[in-house]
Amino acid sequence: MSTHSITGKTVLIAGGAKNLGGMIARDLAAHGAKTVVIHYHSPTSEADAKATLQAVRRTGAEAFAFQADLTQPGAVATLFEKTLQAAGSLDIAINTVGKVLKKPIADTTDEDYDAMFAINTKVAFQFIREAGKHLSNNGKLLSIVTSLLGAYTPFYSTYAGAKAAVEHFTRAASKELGGRGISVNAIGPGPMDTPFFYGQEEPEAVAYHKSAAALSPFSHTGLTEVEDIVPHVRFMVSDGWWMTGQTILVNGGYTTK
């Protein structure tokens, strides 16, 4: 088994029940992962988690799911403990969780700010910290951020600002974990064609993005397709091992950096 192949590896995906996380779980299992552990936030996602577990198991891989609100004290550490208890080891850790808010700075409350930084910054930091403790040597650690890190746009100050911290966490962790052969990176998708994006947008904004293909000659809708992100994730946690400390914007040229 190659050190950097997905074959035979154990994977943990936070936010792995549906949307991008669920598709990553299915894809890595199809490409040879031995065990896939998915996390989901609340009981409302339990049906999605079960569907993803079934899809993963159909590939021949083992699959486990754990529900947790990762913003609660100790929840991220507990997730890693449960993963190791279930799978025995951990080779690849991927954090896809996040929360988006579209609101002018003047209208953003302290509660809004705290909620955004709790999930997008604090949980992301804790995930990197715990992954660093528990990943096997030559492991892979990947965070999902946002292409807004390369955008000049209003209204997403707390979302993009909270995700911006993860870019530095990624650089720092790559230096600290590099001696063990662990690569640490982040991927920033463009606005994706999922409820995560649409839930924050007014109909006019959705229509604009759907007609904005001219902004990216590779896009048919102006939005990033989830299917287009998954191969980049797979690459970063396998053959892309020589890349580390990087935040890669994957959006068909929607924004650049």
Residue ranges and their predicted role:
Residues 140-165, 170-179, 191-192:
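Catalytic loop of short-chain dehydrogenase/reductase
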Residues 33-49:
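Conserved glycine-rich Rossmann-like NAD(P)H-binding loop of the short-chain dehydrogenase/reductase
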Residues 104-105, 112-117, 209-214:
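Substrate-binding pocket helix/loop in short-chain dehydrogenase/reductase
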Residues 3-37:
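Canonical Rossmann dinucleotide-binding motif of NAD(H)/NADP(H)-dependent dehydrogenases/reductases
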Residues 88, 128, 134, 222-250, ...:
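C-terminal substrate-recognition "lid" of short-chain dehydrogenase/reductases
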Residues 178, 183, 243-245:
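Short, small/polar-rich loop/turn modules that mediate ligand/substrate recognition or access, typified
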Residues 179, 204-228:
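Catalytic Tyr-x(3-8)-Lys segment
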